[in-house]
Structures are given as structure tokens and as C-alpha cells.
């Protein structure tokens, strides 16, 4: 996670978006933006520069992969969210502690990362990729998408549906 020593470079689609990002960072105490990619990712791509991406998957596809024993699901929500409800068989590692927990994660498995809707899991997937995990997917819609499909959950008050 970013702190006062983190080098910050922004990717923004125009001046207004850049100003909003700088203001948002300042509100949380980060005021040392080192550079801006003002024409966004498209400008970067137009220059022929390399782009990294994170694979995505749906909740439905994740459920199928789990049934086939093909993936390890990684829940990066807060502990209280995990205790309330979680996907059966998922591993829990809070995104804020993920870098220190990397040795606990399976490097030889496909990993599907999720949070509640997809924001924190995007950050977590980026952390994993940056640290050499190559088989990483971000589950679109997170646990909210999983619930909407009526897929099983564990936790207090959750009625786990039959497999």
C-alpha cells in the first residue's frame, strides 16, 4: 500500500481527472505525485510502450473452476467481512497485509482474487503480479456477483447450498 515514501505516478484521461486524483491523494496525506501520464493508457499504447494487464473472470466461471479443483480463491476483504460471510474453500488474506503474506500463498496454482465488488481485489491482483505470481485473475463483481448468482457461502446465518 502507498505511504509517504511511495513514488506516485498518475494515469489520467485529461486535466480534470488528474486534478481529482491529486486532490483525493492529498486528502489521505499523499502529496508527492512524481509524474502524470496525461493522455491515459491510450496515449501510452499509441507510443508503442508495453502494457501489463490482469486477467478477469466471472463469479460463475470461478465456481466452475472451484468444482474442477482448478483454482485457489483468495478473499482480500477485511477480517470482519470474511467472518460475516465468505466463499467456501477460499483463503483469506487482507489486502493491506498481502505483501507480508506472500510466502503463504500457493505459487503453483491459478489464483482468483476477490473482494466485495472488485476494487480491492484489483489492487491485490496487481500486488501478486508485481511479485511474480503469473496465474492471477480478478473476479469481476466480487462477492456481490457471487451472491447474486445464489452460489454457496459460509459464515454465521449463511445457509450453504448443496454442491
Descriptions of predicted regions:
Residues 1-72, 76-163:
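Rhodanese-like catalytic fold shared by cysteine-dependent sulfurtransferases
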